[in-house]
Amino acid sequence: MRTWVIAVVALVGSGGAALAQDAAAGEQVLKRLCSPCHDVGPEAKIKLGPPLNGIDGRKAGTYEGFNYSPANKSSGITWNEQAFDKYIRAPMQEMPGTRMAFVGIKNDKDVADIWAYLNQFRPEGAKK
């Protein structure tokens, strides 16, 4: 009986555990949901949004040449997996005043996969 209780507690406690990330799946989700506004890779250009190369560790509102909203510039966010996860689910709620008019991505796997894909790229667009 004690073993079952421990197993159930371990199972319930792991609900917030990180999902396996699939960069190839993330590329497809990014192409479908993000590429109308964002670019990534060696030839990435500014579109409606900034390129997403080298996002891990970059301060929000700092991609050179992109006209960010005051909300982005003053957000104090440094992008990492946790900040991205929270923001991408509801950008306009997480950063009131952002120009990113996007309802967000609710699917946990899609969010994890997009991060895995983006995290492959250095600031200049080459893969790590």
Named regions from a protein language model:
Residues 31, 39, 57, 89, ...:
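Residues at helix-coil transition
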Residues 21-44, 52:
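Sequence/structural segment immediately N-terminal to covalent heme-attachment motifs in c-type
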Residues 1-4:
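Positively charged n-region of N-terminal signal peptides that target proteins for export
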Residues 78-128:
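C-terminal capping alpha-helices of c-type cytochrome domains
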Residues 7-8, 18:
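Cleavable N-terminal signal peptides
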Residues 13-17:
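N-terminal signal peptide c-region/cleavage motif recognized by signal peptidases
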Residues 39-43, 54-83, 101-112:
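Electron-transfer interface patches adjacent to heme c in soluble/periplasmic c-type cytochromes
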Residues 25-29, 47, 51, 83, ...:
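Extracytoplasmic/secreted proteins, especially bacterial periplasmic and envelope-associated proteins
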